[in-house]
A protein has these predicted regions:
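Accessory interaction regions appended to the cores of large information-processing enzymes
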Residues: 149, 158-160, 164, 168, ...
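Short, surface-exposed connector motifs at secondary-structure boundaries
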Residues: 73-75, 99-101, 126-132, 248-253, ...
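Amphipathic alpha-helical transducer elements in NTP-driven molecular machines
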Residues: 6-9, 22-23, 45-48, 59-64, ...
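Gly-rich Lys/Arg/Thr-decorated short loops/hinges at beta-loop-alpha junctions or inter-strand turns
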Residues: 46, 72-76, 96-102, 216-226, ...
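A short acidic-Thr-Gly-centered motif at the start of a beta-strand
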Residues: 5, 67-72, 244-250, 431-434
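P-loop NTPase switch module centered on the Walker A-proximal segment
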Residues: 1-105, 109-111, 204, 218
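P-loop NTPase catalytic nucleotide-binding module
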Residues: 1-20, 38, 107-312, 333, ...
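Short hydrophobic beta-strand that contains or immediately precedes a catalytic carboxylate
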Residues: 78-80, 255-256, 442-443
């Protein structure tokens, strides 16, 4: 392969819902560029993308795959992406290096949940969108309905460049209103005839061309003046206006294809090289300090790693985009993210698992390298002495959690190592050990997402694991005032132990004044605050500790021990062993022994006095509540609402959004285990959701009773 200059490079990401036909479109693009001699199929398991065993088993894309084609003296880098929201991390990391996104839409269904979700991510990253309406050869295809759904979801900027003449099982002809030609295709080879538009289609084509001209002119003042002067635009002027509009997301062109029959691929490729921007025409990228950095070959060399993966027999592969300058084989660079030195020993153009060695890559190109020592996803490499660090990619909040445990105890250490490696490949996979719950917790985007990781652990690394229901990080608190005193006394010959502590506990309420007196158990206790310690607890909430000792009944040197005893019990709450929070404790009296009193005595006295007071202070268990936003088709709204209500949710609001219904609800975390699977089952995979932590709230009485009983049984078993 020759070296391509920046102006002859195009970078596209193929987006779309599962089953829309992205992978087969990529096959057709590579076939037209003669990168492959024949097109593969999903059923035959011989596509260039989807080459991993797990993808072939599932017959769908699970990972992003970097590809390329060479077409009319241009290199088009193509990134094929998964269509399931479970693998949104791969979609986002593909959008970053892409300059244009091609949204493949199944003409049987129109806008699907993946179309909507990935469209939002393209919008957030300000990436142009071209719609490729696919599967027009299907007998259930409905182009008009698909177009209408696109306009509902993406607005009036959706503009036809092409429309099908005969969508359905006999589909073989497209009318293009940019070139004002009809293209008729023969078989599935991509061969076509370029014909004049039939008379019976001319009025429709002319009307649509006029709309395209007006939309193109609206994006540029000089073109608008030409349009007013001449009443029309030439084909080249239209391309200029569309190019400007694409960059500004002021136009979303619509193309017609059948990737299965290779219909429309050449026209789409022509549009990509003639209208879509080259990397140097794209808006500047941002560095971590907010500076803008243009893609320019004359600048010092830099690259950004958007994907890291591990391939059998090869090791770690880093996929990158050349952000500036040019990268040459055996080039020494500096990792601006961690200050490490790296040598880019080899450069490759990549098409799935196939790699072609290259001597250099120019600004804007996409390639891969191996054997970097300490460079991962989101890292920047730059020329020595020219430190540049690009802003990291950002990913959605996690929305699925499970506990994970190696079946063989000896694999536990290896398990952590390989999951951390998985996180480097897919930043939406997160693992942590919860000291509180005493579980290894695994977080991701859905059950299917983490099941793929489970398969990889077993089949690639020979680690068999179990997924367990994750425990819930409950909290404990109190709702009323209570008093307790406790004497710790131990005598067994020699020096003994003695400490007595009197305390009052009450709920912490922000802004409430310090205590002066308490009325408790028909007794008035006057308080004189001598010292106050306000502790922001690691697990959330507060502890306010008051020293109210007068007359030296407890020496001040023992107060830290009392506080330590209280904190120990708050770390293992009196009700269920969960963290306690939002409590005020006033130690106002006690007793010492001149010989037997020591720190351990007062720690134990403080711990037990607190425990006893807590249990009579209206103790409550609190549970984490998440705000959940569900995007669901209208016909499934009732089922989803009913399911949410069965999960003890509170519906905050409902709204219509771009052809979907949006439900916002507050749902206990305990009710969200495997929700992604349940939602998929309820809606046949047509809905999605996201969630974020909201607050802790008291559990209902019946739930508290169940939790107390379960904790009691668990304690007996131990």
């Amino acid at each position: 392969m020759k070296t391509y200059s920046t102006d002859h490079i195009r970078n596209i990401a193929l987006l779309g819902n599962t089953g829309s036909g992205k992978t087969i479109l990529a096959e057709s693009m590579m076939f037209e560029g003669k990168v492959i001699e024949r097109r593969g199929t999903i059923d035959a398991k011989n596509t260039v993308s989807d080459y991993t065993e797990i993808e072939q088993q599932n017959q769908r894309s699970i990972f992003s795959t970097v590809l390329y084609t060479e077409y009319k003296d241009h290199k088009i880098n193509i990134i094929d992406t998964p269509g399931s929201d479970d693998f949104v991390g791969a979609v986002i990391s593909s959008l970053y290096p892409a300059d244009v996104s091609i949204m493949v839409v199944n003409s049987q269904y129109g806008v699907e949940v993946g179309t909507e979700i990935f469209g939002r991510h393209a919008e957030r990253l300000h990436k142009p969108i071209i719609f490729a309406v696919n599967q027009l050869d299907h007998d259930k295809s409905n182009f008009d309905q698909t177009l209408e759904s696109l306009k509902v979801s993406f607005g009036s900027k959706v503009t036809l460049v092409q429309y099908p003449v005969n969508a359905g099982s006999d589909f073989n002809a497209i009318i293009d209103v940019l070139t004002m030609k009809m293209y008729r295709y023969k078989g599935d080879t991509g061969e076509r005839e370029e014909l004049d538009i039939p008379a019976e289609e001319m009025d429709k084509a002319a009307e649509l061309q006029n709309t395209l001209i007006e939309t193109a002119a609206e994006n540029d003042e000089s073109l608008m003046e030409m349009f007013f002067d001449k009443g029309t635009l030439t084909e080249d002027e239209m391309r200029q206006g569309i190019r400007i509009g694409l960059l500004a997301r002021g136009i979303f062109p619509v193309f017609c294809i059948s990737s299965k029959r290779n219909i429309g691929t050449k026209r789409l490729l022509d549009f990509i090289i003639n209208v879509c921007p080259s990397p140097d025409k794209m808006p500047a990228s941002k560095t971590i300090d907010g500076k803008e950095f243009k893609c320019n070959v004359s600048e010092p060399a830099s690259l950004f790693v958007f994907k890291t993966s591990v391939e059998p027999h090869i090791g770690e592969i880093n996929y990158f985009k050349v952000m500036s300058g040019k990268i040459t084989e055996a080039m020494d660079m500096v990792n601006s993210t961690n200050d490490g030195k790296e040598r880019v020993s080899q450069l490759f153009a990549v098409a799935g698992k196939n790699r072609q060695k290259l001597p250099e890559l120019m600004a804007g190109d996409i390639g891969a390298t191996v054997k970097l020592k300490n460079t991962k996803t989101n890292h920047t490499l730059s020329a020595p002495g020219k430190s540049i660090q690009f802003a990291s990619m950002t990913f959605p909040n996690i929305k699925y959690r499970t506990a994970i445990k190696a079946k063989n105890e000896s694999d536990t250490e290896k398990l952590g190592e390989y999951i951390n490696r998985a996180h480097q490949e897919d930043p939406t996979i997160i693992v942590e050990y919860s000291k509180e719950l005493k579980q290894i917790l695994l977080f991701g985007q859905g059950e299917h997402h983490l099941n793929i990781l489970k398969w990889q652990l077993l089949n690639l690394y020979k680690i068999d694991v179990d997924f367990l229901a994750p425990k819930i990080p409950y909290r404990e608190t109190i709702t009323k005032l209570a008093q307790s005193d406790y004497r710790h006394k131990k005598q067994s010959g020699g020096a003994g132990q003695f400490g007595e502590v009197h305390m009052v506990v009450e709920p912490y309420i922000e802004g409430a004044p310090d205590p002066k007196k308490y009325n408790v158990n028909n007794k008035e206790i006057n308080i004189s605050v001598r010292g106050k310690e306000e502790i922001n607890l690691e697990w959330g909430g507060k502890l306010i500790f008051y020293n109210c000792i007068v007359g030296g009944s407890i020496d001040t040197r023992f107060l830290p021990a009392i506080l330590k005893g209280i904190m120990e019990k708050m770390e293992e709450g009196p009700l269920t062993g969960s963290y306690a929070r939002d409590i005020k404790v006033a130690v106002y009296d006690g007793k010492m022994h001149p010989v037997d009193s020591n720190e351990i005595s007062f720690k134990l006295a403080g711990r037990n006095a607190f425990k006893n007071a807590f249990k009579i202070a209206g103790p409550k268990i609190m549970e984490p509540i998440y705000e959940v936003e569900v995007l669901v088709p209208s016909d499934k709204m009732g089922d989803v609402m009913s399911d949410l209500q069965n999960r003890r949710s509170i519906i905050l609001g409902m709204d219509s959004e771009k052809g979907f219904e949006k439900i916002i609800a507050r749902v206990p975390l305990a009710e969200l285990h495997k929700y992604s699977t349940a939602l998929s089952s309820l809606t046949s995979g047509r809905a999605t959701y996201n969630m974020k932590f909201s607050s802790y709230e008291q559990v209902p009485a019946d739930v508290q009773d169940k939790l107390l009983k379960a904790y009691e049984e668990e304690s007996e078993d131990e």
